[in-house]
Amino acid sequence: MKKHAKKWLAMALSLSVACMMLPAVGFAAGNVASVDGTEYATVQQAVDNANGKTVVLLDNVTESITIAKGQTIKLDLGGYTLTNTAKQHTITNNGTLTIQGSGKVDNVDHGKGALVNNGEVTIAGGTLTRSQEKGTDAATSGGNSWYVVDNHGTITMTGGQIINTSGFSSLVRNIGATFNLKNGTLQNTFIVLKNDDNGVFNMTGGKVVTTGSQGSALQNWGKATISGGTLSATGGGVALQALEWDKKYQSVTEVKAGATVDGDVLVRQDPDYNTGEIEFTVTGGTINGNVTAGAGAEVALEGGSVSGALGTIADSGKLVVSGGSYAQSPAKYLAADAAAAGIGKQGGSATYYVGTPAQIEQRVEKAAAGDAVEVLQGDLNVTLPDGVAVINSGSGEVIVNDQPVTGEGVVTHTHKAVKVEAKDATETEAGNIAYWYCEGCGKYFADEALTKEITKDDTVVPAKGQAAQQPTATPGVNPQTGDNSNASVWAAMLSLAAIGAAGTACAAYRKRKAQ
């Protein structure tokens, strides 16, 4: 028995020694980050030893970190959460930082953010948030509210998300800085991205969503170019708001092809200040909402499409439409040299197109039978198929199928006339001239070119016998005696009178001869 016990003890000791000799595959207790396999007790220690390398989180950790100027690192969240030290920002970047992985960067203190950037940051993954946010509306911070991201450098977002539920603070402030959104999601209850004084915002992809009634997906006080992605207002707020409070910080916004704006657009001065004109231009993209120009706004709609209404809310607000397509008539805001026409099914709604006369002619000529065309403005000369109703409600000259169109309108028709050969009339049967008849519209024409319209009666040649049977006497030759006279009696009386006159004449002649 003792022999077996000693044997088992020897085996256990051997196994222990073998295990000690194996390379470590687990994480040392208390270490929270690693760089190239080397573990560190704090994330900051890992950052300080990771220039040009990747810091990987090994656990959830409460710690605030700073990336020094001139330093370049990648922070892989590794599925864990980095939460701030009390009363500090979670990450302060003065160098070059890439955030990646599926974890979170959180801040839980009032007046502090998950990321404050003074250098260059690429957000490729993860979630940046403020999980203890208490702001409920524009007047109530709840004692714990701030931006999730405060940018004073350059941020390029290619993935991940920045999310909060604040009704008091903007999600991202971009002030004197550049924010490039290529992919990823930004979402907040209030203002999502506040492009502040001298800020530059370039959006080529991704989503920016406001969920509150007082929110704005993008509030632009600087320069913003939207050429892709989606700005969205889902809770009754504004998808895109352009403002200006001081003309030295000019607000310039451009919406280009590829952009989608799901919600209303509002362009105006800050009501508490008197500033210069706010430039807002749409050259492409889709706006699923209203476009309103307020005080100081200079809105130019040169392309794209708008599904809502156009309007101004102040005398100083300017809105000019020179291109694009619209669900409601833009007639009130058309540029002087623009042509415009509405096209849709007869009795239905129309889509209104604005552009050069040549562009609108091309649009109009796509109309088919059963369509209605209303020309709002411009001189147009088009060829249309049968069955298109056209009205000219503007002051331009509109020619359709070589015929002028006025406010009374026309329904287009292409005559398909058949020639009817001439037929001689007989004594008893009427004939006809040669003519052309269009069965489609029931019209008659005297020439092959169909330029001389005639009536059906004009085609008839009366039967020859009809002329011979007409009475020679004219009305009123009968004596007015109360009844019809006998023609033979009157003839006899006339004969006797003639004989008597002749006898008298002969007697007078003999008398003159005798003398």
Go through the PLM ranges and name each one.
Residues 62-74, 82-100, 107-121, 137, ...:
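Extracellular beta-strand-rich solenoid/capping regions of secreted or surface-exposed proteins
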Residues 410-411, 454-485:
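C-terminal low-complexity, Ser/Thr- and acidic/Pro-rich disordered "stalk" regions positioned immediately N-terminal
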Residues 499-515:
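C-terminal membrane-anchoring or membrane-association module
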Residues 49-62, 73-80, 363-381, 389-394:
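Glycine-rich repeat segments that build the extracellular carbohydrate-interaction surface of secreted
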Residues 30-58, 346-374:
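Acidic Gly/Asp/Thr-rich repetitive segments characteristic of extracellular carbohydrate-active
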Residues 55, 65, 73-75, 89, ...:
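Solenoid scaffold repeats with emphasis on beta-solenoid/beta-helix
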Residues 79-87, 100-111, 124-145, 157-169, ...:
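Beta-strand-rich solenoid/repeat architectures in extracellular/passenger domains
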Residues 21-32, 477-490, 506-510:
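Sec-dependent signal peptide cleavage junction
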